[in-house]
């Protein structure tokens, strides 16, 4: 299965290059037969939504889920993707997050579009080298997409 109408709606306003990568990654994901669907959790964010997410774990209840008020989501240069089965996100399944990372990096390489993953902030191919891992997050790097 590829992207749903809901996923495509969530990609509205996202930079076309990133949409190209996500669409190709979804096609690759579908061939893996993981039993999980790939969903677009979030694309473009409003400043209000970003402020609410930033407050989480700081001045509002919950755990910290973002480290900046200057998110690439605000400009349509980022997406959050999640593997889901029976309505449940596979948060604890490292293998699925690694598979998603591989799908995205393969799709980006094929399209010759640079991406930065929340699992690999410095883009060196080594995932989770920092404590601020954000497995669902993929963005177009500022140095290529100001």
Question: What are the residue ranges of the model-derived segments?
Answer:
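Active-site acidic/histidine clusters and adjacent loop/turn architecture
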Residues: 1-42
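Catalytic cores and adjacent binding grooves of peptidoglycan-active enzymes
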Residues: 68-146
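Extended, low-complexity, intrinsically disordered C-terminal regulatory tails
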Residues: 26-60, 110, 120
């Amino acid at each position: 299965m590829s992207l749903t109408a809901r996923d495509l709606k969530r990609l509205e306003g996202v930079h076309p290059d990133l949409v190209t990568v996500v669409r190709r990654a979804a096609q690759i994901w579908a061939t893996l037969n993981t039993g999980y669907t790939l969903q677009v959790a979030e694309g473009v964010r409003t400043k209000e939504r970003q402020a609410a997410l930033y407050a989480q774990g700081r001045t509002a209840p919950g755990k910290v889920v973002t480290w900046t008020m200057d998110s690439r989501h605000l400009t349509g240069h980022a997406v959050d993707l999640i593997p889901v089965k029976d309505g449940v996100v596979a948060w604890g399944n490292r293998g699925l997050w690694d598979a998603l990372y591989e799908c995205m990096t393969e799709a980006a390489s094929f399209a010759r579009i640079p991406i930065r993953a929340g699992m690999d902030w410095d883009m060196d191919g080594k995932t989770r080298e920092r404590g601020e891992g954000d497995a669902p997050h993929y963005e177009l790097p500022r140095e290529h997409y100001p």
